[in-house]
Amino acid sequence: MRAQYVLDASALLSIVLDERGHQRVGGILDRSRIHAVNLAEVVGRLVRSGMPAERAVATLHELHLEVEEEFGAGQAEFCGALMGTRRDLGLSLGDCVCLTMAAWSGAVAVTADRRWKELEGTVVNDETIRIELIR
């Protein structure tokens, strides 16, 4: 079954750190996936906060979340176009990877970043961006 949701780093961190919004993410986790780039952001954030890398990785594996590793030329072009046209939102590469993955698969991008709501319904290269805020 194709994932209905694509999580960004903030959404996954809400589960791991028991932050506000974690209930919503927990409720859709079995229908969600994340890109490896965003997973790397989560591991980095956990390690920076003092969690040993091995523990961070083990904690994330326990969630059994589908991890997407592919990112082709077409997706890179979409991602770059998004980064270039919405610089005003301060989107990182990881943000744009998540948004690209969601738009290309017809899924909803899930985030805690309120700035993303401005992207709801944006069409880039014939793909529509859909956003859900967890808080």
Residue spans for each PLM region:
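Short, well-structured N-terminal submotif of metal-dependent ribonuclease cores
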Residues: 1-34, 46-58
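Short, hinge-like loop/turn segments at secondary-structure boundaries
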Residues: 49-53, 86-87, 126-130
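Active-site neighborhoods of divalent-metal-dependent phosphate/nucleic-acid chemistry enzymes
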Residues: 68-114
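Acidic, PIN/NYN-like endoribonuclease modules and their adjacent C-terminal/linker elements
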Residues: 2, 99, 103-135
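A generic structural signal for short hydrophobic patches within well-formed alpha-helices
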Residues: 12-13, 39, 116-117
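Active-site-proximal, substrate-binding regions of enzyme catalytic domains
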Residues: 37-72, 76
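Anionic group-transfer/hydrolysis microenvironments
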Residues: 10, 43, 113-115
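Short loop->beta-strand "edge-of-pocket" segments that line small-molecule binding or catalytic clefts
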Residues: 5, 31-34, 63-68, 108
